[in-house]
């Protein structure tokens, strides 16, 4: 009987952890603008990505910077979602970066898993991030929260 209780308890804990992980996957987390505004110049500069670092132009409204790896299946799904959004809304850009080729940026932004997507404003400042596979709903919510005027203005 005690073994059965232990097995049931372990299954309950594993299920709870799995549901928690799934709920967090791909969810948008905004960067607090008051922290950036009050940060020293060198820290604020670290939260900005330039066209040279990206190797591509910034979107007029927002840019999704997706950090991926070659063997990452969720990265391909996230790429498809973001590419579709960019094709549907003017002023958006999507840049995919291989983590192996951009270790400096991986360290700078604390990328711990792929895919991780940073959302940049029109000036290249990181305004939010999504860790894990991103679906359309989470990507649209990120734009709504970060773009002046929301998605309808994009």
For the regions a protein language model found, what residue spans apply to each?
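N-terminal targeting signals for export/organelle localization
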Residues: 1-45
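Anionic-ligand binding region
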Residues: 43, 47-56, 60
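Short active-site neighborhood of thiol/selenol oxidoreductases, capturing the structured segment around
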Residues: 58-69
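The canonical Cys-X-X-Cys-His
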Residues: 72-75, 117
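Typically the conserved alpha-helix immediately C-terminal to a functionally engaged Cys/Sec
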Residues: 76-88
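Thiol-based oxidoreductase modules, predominantly thioredoxin-like and allied folds used
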Residues: 90-104
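Structural micro-motif
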Residues: 110-118
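Non-catalytic, surface beta->alpha helical segment in thiol-disulfide oxidoreductase systems
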Residues: 119-154
């Amino acid at each position: 009987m005690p073994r059965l209780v232990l097995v049931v308890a372990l299954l309950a804990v594993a299920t709870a952890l799995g549901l928690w992980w799934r709920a967090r996957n791909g969810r948008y987390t905004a960067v607090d603008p008051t922290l950036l505004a009050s940060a020293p110049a060198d820290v604020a500069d670290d939260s900005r990505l330039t066209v040279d670092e990206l190797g591509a132009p910034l979107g007029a409204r927002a840019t999704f910077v997706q950090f991926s790896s070659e063997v990452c299946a969720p990265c391909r799904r996230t790429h498809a979602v973001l590419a579709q959004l960019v094709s549907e809304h003017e002023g958006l850009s999507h840049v995919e970066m291989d983590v192996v080729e951009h270790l400096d940026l991986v360290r700078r932004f604390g990328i711990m898993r792929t895919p991780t997507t940073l959302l940049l404003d029109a000036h290249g400042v990181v305004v939010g991030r999504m860790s894990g596979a991103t679906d359309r709903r989470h990507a649209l919510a990120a734009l709504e929260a970060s773009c002046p005027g929301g998605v309808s203005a994009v």
